[in-house]
Amino acid sequence: KGITYNVINSHLNNIVQQSIDFENKCLTEKLKVTKELIQQNISTNKNKLDEVGEIREKTLFDVFDEFIKEIGNINGWTHGTYEKYIALRNHLYIFSPNLSFDDLTEKGLADFITHLRDEKGLRNSTIGKQLGFLKWFLKWSANNGYHKNMAYLSFKPKLKTTEKRIIFLTWDELMTVYNFSIPESKKYLDRVRDVFCFCCFTSLRYSDVYNLKRFDIKNGALHITTVKTADSLTIDLNKYSQAILDKYDGVPFEDNKALPVISNQKMNDYIKELGQLCGLDQPETVTYYVGNERVDEVYPKYELMGTHTGRRTFISNAIMMGIPPQVVMKWTGHSDYKAMKPYIAIADSAKAEAMKLFNEK
């Protein structure tokens, strides 16, 4: 039936382990080994065999679960990364509950792409990421002897995409938020504003500001190991970030946290509310493709704001201030200069606009 050696070895290992477990149980519980007891043990584990005693091959989804467990453990995946691969598994299952490796020919892969586009309504950029995750799984499973279907190697669909728009606050907008007088009826936004602005002044991701402890702050700098990439960073404090820390000095928080950080989802909701309150409602256009169809959507800026806006605000303003990208990368933990290019483009555009001011004199 084309069963791979990995499947056979896995099955034999299971049988050996079951025998060891049975022997240990008899010893610890001082059971008398009888024919009936042995038959009962075999019956308990009969799901490992099919009706005629043949080895049952793992399904694609069994292998996918093994992939997630092994690769996630080796690479120290964050909760967010696990969620991405679980989402892919769910997409595959909805596409075909009995999906096999042999089904994923170029046509099968194309059908899956069509399913993601037409049935799930995913953007091309999202489909591209899902395909990348799927190819990693197929490569890993092929290397581990689970299949010999290499169609994924030559499957390279042309998916129209656009550069992702970077939503950030200009310095004036950031100062508007930082200095805004929040009304008494919305005082619950005060702490959210402080944490958000702290990210804008330090480049911290939500996961890192959430984990920030008081003992991480020494000699005028933050000394952290990032959650997402496990980078060890030293981020110097400026007068704005220091003032926010000073505001909460002596205020006790759970787990010795430095700041009052709420859940990511709740904070995202409140940041949008804060942006609206501060009048950050200029129209922003978001462009993307679904198949060959171009979609342009216009939103008030505050609707596009979230915890991620803090980090992007720091990078954009730092580069526009003239701080060299290689210095900014030391604070942010970026190792790839390519990641800085969109921000440098923003800074170049801003400089061109600034030069026009001379024409008005």
What do the PLM-derived regions correspond to, one by one?
Residues T202, N211-K247:
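Conserved tyrosine-mediated DNA breakage-rejoining catalytic core shared by Y-recombinases
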Residues F215-A221, L304, M321-P342:
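Short, polar N-cap/turn motifs at the start of nucleic acid-interacting alpha helices
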Residues E184-K186, P252-F253, K257, K272-K330:
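Short, basic (Lys/Arg/His-rich) helix/loop patches that form interaction surfaces
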Residues H91, D102-L104, E119-L153, R205-S207, ...:
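N-terminal DNA-binding recognition helix of tyrosine site-specific recombinases/integrases
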Residues N124, G128, H147, A151-Y206, ...:
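Basic, Lys/Arg- and aromatic-enriched nucleic-acid-binding interface segment
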